Amino acid sequence: EKRNVGMVFQSYALFPNMTVAENIGYGLRIRRAPVAALRARVSEMLAMMRIEPLADRRIEQLSGGQRQRVALARALAVRPRAILLDEPLTALDAKLRDTLRLEIDGLLRSLGITAIYVTHDQAEAMALGDRIVVMDRGRVAQVGTPREIYHRPANRFVAEFIGSLNRLTGAVQGGVFVCAAGTLPWQTGGPAVREILFRPERTHLIPPEGASLRGTVAAAFFLGDRTRLFVDVGEGQPVIVENGQRREFVHGEAVGLQVEPGDVFVL
């Protein structure tokens, strides 16, 4: 209260003995806001969250998404300098999470309120964050924009924690990286490099004939908008490929792999 910081808890922490309107106005009431100002602010928040019809309902009568909106309205009603959101979407189903994530982003940006958003969902952090702080066992591993964190991870932990990661082991010989799967033009690091890293979505399938990197399909999972392939390249860990083609893949099918040198990094 003294720091003027709002908070949205993972469990929402709404008061079951109060109506929706009373919950939203609670922070203003304990600050002894004038009654007229309190009512006006509650009406404003109800409209902003599009929950006016719920004003007189009890908390047990609300769905998970409605409770989340009430909790956010309560935190914003006091016009905080900053707001802390502690995994506010964890308890919701995937489709509702996507909808509310978009609403929260638009609302906080329109109000110009600084938000600290705690989440274990990497996609959520990438979608909402202007700056991301990656924590490793209580210590800051990296601070940066979503693009910096994803494309230029500071260390192995960050690279593996944010998104999926492919790796190939081998050695640099004559300007190319040589591994069990074949060769890759090399321009990233020095001759001492023994492992290269790259993202699944930057790994492309090409015909195996003439491909410098080759493997066989170990597994293929159709996910609707794409197929996730696990390609055996002669190493312990398969290479993951996110492929948008509509064709089906069969176990043991030979495929070629293409990775642009600029999409490869070393740590």
Which residue ranges define each predicted feature?
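Small-residue-enriched segments and motifs
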Residues: 102, 156, 170, 215-218
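Nucleotide-binding/hydrolysis machinery
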Residues: 161
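Non-catalytic connector elements of ABC transporters
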Residues: 165-167, 176-267
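Short, flexible active-site-adjacent loop segments at beta-strand->alpha-helix junctions, enriched
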Residues: 1, 18, 261-263
